[in-house]
Amino acid sequence: GVVIDIGEGVSKVRESDKVILTWIRSDGAECAGAKYQKGNTIINSGPITTFNNFTVVSENRCVKLPEGIPMDLAPLLGCAIPTGAGIIFNTIKPKHNNTLAVFGLGGIGLSAIMAANALECSTIIAVDIEDHKLKTAKELGATHLINNRDGGALDEILKF
């Protein structure tokens, strides 16, 4: 998004800066998540308040968008990539000869595929019900594809 206005003490971003909102805390001020009210319903929108046209966020949830990265790809940097790649690099930590299966090939799953490929996992199994997502997974490093539209993915995976 684009910074419309800043509050007192904000030094990390300026008005008109292009930014990525992320759930990963960085430096800068932290404040409570925003709340919105519609009639008698109060919505706690959390620390980054996504899916809005405008939002109020803590400075430490904004990262300036690096030059050369298009705005339409920026949202992937705030959630899908750190979640999908983060689970591979920081939690699973597979070795190059490990087999890994990823179920669901949205932004998070495809980011996990890319991370597993970067770690040179020998077998990366992509599972989804959409052929176009499986094709993308193959392009990003999946070694085996399973369309689970009719079930049976687990039986297929156990063959590896």
Which residues does each predicted region cover?
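Short, well-ordered alpha-helices that flank and scaffold nucleotide-derived cofactor binding pockets
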Residues: F89-N90, M114-A118
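Hydrophobic packing within well-folded, soluble alpha/beta domains
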Residues: G1-V3, V13, T55, L65, ...
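Hydrophobic/small residue at the entry helix of a nucleotide-binding pocket
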Residues: T83, I108, A116
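NAD(P)H dinucleotide-binding glycine-rich loop of Rossmann-like/cofactor-binding domains
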Residues: R25-F103
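Adenosine-nucleotide cofactor-binding segment
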Residues: T99-L105, N117-F160
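Glycine-rich beta-strand-centered segment in the early N-terminal region that forms part
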Residues: G1-G28, P66-I69
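Conserved sugar-transfer catalytic core signal across GT-A, GT-B, and GT-C glycosyltransferases
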Residues: I87, A112, K133
